[in-house]
Amino acid sequence: MRSGSRRSRNGLIVGTEVTQADGYAERRAALDMIHRHSPGSTRRLTLAADKSYDCADFVKHLRQACVTPHVAQKVRYSAIDGRTTRHPGYAVSQKRRKKIEEPFGWAKTVGPMAQTMLRGIKRVGAQFTLTMAASNLARLPRLLAG
């Protein structure tokens, strides 16, 4: 399972993590990256994510870590309450959500991540980190142009 954290201002990947897929790995990796990014910080962060992150435990852990969850809501039930969805920033995050997945799509189509030939978490993790760095380098000319 591959995860990455991204800066919303410029869309560059700032952190990666590869874990064993077990149904909870993405959420655990996201929490680990948040705690590594700002350990003990009281500055409010925002996390934008897809529907797979909409579960009560994950949202509770985010709120305890001073992170606002801008997670896409599940249709039948959602852990995201009305105070979050009514905020104008939530609507903006939902529109920008597509940008989160673009580097992962690039890694699978242009980069070598569609079917890796490596085995082991460390090796695949190194390949994934290198691929995300290449994705950032590919985006830089467009960012510098304006």
Where are these regions (language model features)?
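Anion-binding and metal-coordination hotspots
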Residues: 1-146
